[in-house]
Every structure is written in structure tokens, then in C-alpha cells.
């Protein structure tokens, strides 16, 4: 048998023409050689390799986006709450994730702190003071905004004086500088327009443009190396612009919220007189347009969805979607079904818009389907029955409420106060949602913070 196999091999190799074609289909090694010879030269080229890799990456990116979109759609119905104990702090107004386990928060009682979501540990951060202390201590204002720059190397928030802008370096939270000569009233909102420039919106109706220069950063590093106590610079604004004031109610032109469109370098602003303003924001601020909002009561929150090119504005009971390229009569609005309590926070994640209300609810709006996510029918024993078609709604826990003199005099007959969702933010994975706030009535003192995952 061995000699016979050898003779066939010799015969096949001796007849490379027709004999090879006849025997090729019967022997794997002849067939594979034949296939290799037929590969076109272009498939071995660098150009073909790069094109193939590009197509593969596009397919992987498309698949990844589909996966993230599906996760964003399914996640809200799976979220479970874990509350944190914040002691006697009063109302968390602002929050941002620093990393996968730390969230930085600002409160009405002017406290800046970091919470570890794994251990629940609270670490307070020293707030930065003006060059010259103000003559009057302002009560009941606090820290309303916290924002990280695009590279996540700097953090902007309010200072000890709520009219001032404070800048910290990340991840150490070392102080860098204070902008303390701009606004005459509280800072309500902040937006970074690049890695070194931020805009602040104030209750005095002005918007300040601030720059953290390389010189400021270098001097800040040098001071930290030689001084045992925190030291920081004091900077002045590059520009200070007033928003247009409505003739009928000029005293209510307070800048309440900001959101930046990085692609077009445009900054959206919402004022409490019910207007949306659009500014070109690069090295200065140039007004582009102002438009009256369809629902103009309690416009206190704003977010920009880059993928959808729309701004989402919260009001007393509605979320309105504005595309500055479209006429104002094309503005679409959806009702939260929680009239009177107000939309207190709003954010985009994939195609889902998360809405936090004054009644302690989290609602989820699907911008593609143009409807709120609905409850799933649960077949679990003992679960609370839900009606088909009900909006999916997550409700915050009890938090902590101070039974002080105000509560005893005016609210002691009310057993439970919902905690308004003043702030919420997703982590980088989109699977954890930090939610915080406190009681809605301004005279009540309390807090709430929780991780939904």
C-alpha cells in the first residue's frame, strides 16, 4: 500500500497539467495549493488590508452602538436603589462622577463633598474664598453647579461666595483659582466650552467667560510644592455679557441653566423669564438668537443631545425639545404627568432622556419612539400590579428630613415629603445612575442621595 501511494504521488507530480486538475479534488494538499495559486494579488496588498480593517472597525462600531442603545432601553426597568446617609447636609443641587466609584456633590448649605459609592464614605472638600471677603454673608444659596472639562483634568463649581467661580485640579482636587470679580449674584450654571475656558451663568442675568491659562496652572503647581496650606490664584473674566431682558419682566431675567454644543461651538442658555438664548462661544460670547419657550414657568434645567442636535428644556410640567435650526413653532413638548412639581433635572444618554421631577420621580423618554418608557407587566408573586401603558417611574427613597421649627410650624401634619431630584448623572458605563436632591419646599431642610444600578 505504501509503494502504491508513492507511485501515485510521483504520477501526480509528473503530470502538472490535466492530471493535476483530475486529482486535485481528491487530495486536500493538491486542492489547497491550487486555491492559493488562484488568490488575486490585490488581496495581499496593504491597501486591501487597510480597507478590510476599516470596514471591520465600522461594523464593530455599529454593533457597539446598537448594543449600547439596547442597554439604555432596557436598563431603567432593571435599576435598584441603594441610599446613602449624608448626615445633616441640606439638599444636594449638583453632582458629577469623578471615576467609577466616586461622585462629587454640591449642596444648598454650600458644602462640596465626594461620596464613595462602594463604601458610602463622605469626604468634604475645602471651598475656595474670594480675594476680599464680602461684607454680607449670603444664606440659602449654595453650590448649584459642578462641571468637568472635556479632558477631565479640571473641575469648575461655586466658591465660598456663591457669586464666584472656583476651579480645582483633578484627580487630586487641589485648588487652582477663583474668579471673584464677575457676577453680582449667585452662579446657577456652568459649562466648559473647551479644556481651559468655562462659562458661568448667574442670577444677575449675566454670563461670564473665564480662562484657566497655562500660567495660572504652572503657578498653582509651584505654590502647592512650597506651601503646606492650600493656595490658589484669583482670575478675572475674559468677557461678561448680559442676556436680553424682556420689557415686561426685566427683574426675572436670571440665567438658570447652560448647555454647550461642541460641534457648532454654540452655547444654549435658559432664563427664568421663559426664554431660550443661543450664543456663539469661542474666544468670546456673541448672541445668535432668543426665542420664547412654549412652556415658560420654572425653566430650571437644560441639556444638549449631540446625536440628535436638540436642546431639552425642563419646565413646570413639560420637557420641550428645541432645534435652533428649525422655526420656533416646531418646538415639540411632552408632559411629565406630574403637574405642579416641576422638572428639576434632565439628561441625555443614548436615545433615552432621563427626567428628574420635584415629586421624587425618575422618568425615561425615548426620543426615537417619541414616548416615555412604559412599565413591564410583572408576573412575580407579591409584586404590585401595574396597569398596561403606565409610564415607567422610579421613586426616590425617604432620605433625611430635619424636624426643625419650620417643619413643626408648617408641615408637621404631613407624614412624608418626596425628595425632588435636583441632580442625576450616569457613570461612564451607563449602568449606574447617581441621583440626589432633597425636599422641594424651600423652607425644609433635608437631603437624599442614592445609587441606582
Curated annotation (Swiss-Prot):
SMART domains referenced in this protein's UniProt entry, alphabetically: WD40 (SM00320)
Region annotated Disordered, chain positions: 1-34
Disruption phenotype: Knockout mice are born at expected Mendelian ratios and manifest no apparent physical abnormalities. Mutants have testes that produce fewer mature sperms, an altered percentage of CD4(+) T-cells and natural killer (NK) cells as well as increased splenocyte apoptosis after T cell activation.
Nucleus as UniProt keyword: yes
Chain positions covered by the region annotation Required for nuclear location and interaction with MOV10: 1-38
Pathway: Protein modification; protein ubiquitination
Repeat (WD) residue spans along the chain: 138-178, 182-220, 250-289, 338-375
The keyword Repeat appears for this protein: yes
Pfam families: Beta-prop_DCAF12
GO cellular component, one term: cytosol
Compartmental location: Cytoplasm; Cytoplasm, Cytoskeleton, Microtubule organizing center, Centrosome; Nucleus
GO biological process: protein ubiquitination; regulation of autophagy; T cell activation; ubiquitin-dependent protein catabolic process via the C-end degron rule pathway
SUPFAM superfamilies: WD40 repeat-like
An example molecular function term from Gene Ontology annotations: ubiquitin-like ligase-substrate adaptor activity
Function: Substrate-recognition component of a DCX (DDB1-CUL4-X-box) E3 ubiquitin-protein ligase complex of the DesCEND (destruction via C-end degrons) pathway, which recognizes a C-degron located at the extreme C terminus of target proteins, leading to their ubiquitination and degradation. The C-degron recognized by the DesCEND pathway is usually a motif of less than ten residues and can be present in full-length proteins, truncated proteins or proteolytically cleaved forms.
Identification of the protein by name: DDB1- and CUL4-associated factor 12
Organism: Mus musculus (Mouse)
The gene coding this protein: Dcaf12
